[in-house]
Amino acid sequence: MHEPLISGGAVRRLWVGETELYRQHLLRLDAESRRSRFGGAVSDAFIERYAEPSALRDAVIYGFFVDGVLRGAAELRLLARAGEAEAALSVERVWQSCGVGTALLERVLLAAGNRQVKHLHMLCLAENRRLQQLARKFDAELSFRSGSVVGDVKAPRPTPISMVRELMADGTDLATAMLDVPTQPAKRLEHSNGSPERRTRERRYERLMLVDNWR
């Protein structure tokens, strides 16, 4: 689902071969945004380790792109307890309070429900009013725990329609990523055998799908 958003931006899924885009986005976060995302001050070295492909293998990530640059992201991780998952959002300062978090969380909830998740947990600092307001928008139950707030959002139940929606969205997202134009509709390439465009597309596909990412 290549969804148009504010100022020509769009939300789509990130694939395993695009972890470098996620790393660069996290490194661009200012000090306050980093603290909100990770629950405390973190260094560049911490982010470098956090965004290693091996560390993100179990995550499903959606991104908000503007002119091909990742400006916001939502990360979904299944928990050991059946039916539970956690989500974390990050948005670069200039794009905050612009509806980016809402668009990202909508995609996360669709993916969570289709993975049999019943409860989606979102942890934030007590002073992070913006994320708490976002969670309330999705009817979250908030509980306060020693300086932190946990939002519990009920994920929608999976249906044949929701499964088809995600499959179609993933297909469009992958095609967009292959063409390397994240904020533009996928354009048709020449289909002549051995064309430079086709070889470039095939190489990009191989890079995007380095490991199985179809969870």
Description of each model-found segment:
Residues 78-87, 96, 145-147:
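A conserved beta-turn-beta hairpin within the catalytic core of GNAT-like acetyltransferases
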Residues 97-112, 119-121, 133, 137:
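Conserved acetyl-CoA-binding loop-helix of GNAT-fold acetyltransferases
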Residues 1-7, 123-215:
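Terminal substrate-recognition subdomain of acyl/acetyltransferases
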Residues 88-97, 125:
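A short, internal acetyl-CoA/4′-phosphopantetheine-binding micro-motif in the GNAT/acyltransferase core
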Residues 28, 36-84, 92:
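Acetyl-CoA-dependent GNAT
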Residues 17-21, 82, 126-130:
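Short alpha-helical
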Residues 9-24:
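A short beta-loop-alpha structural element at the N-terminal edge
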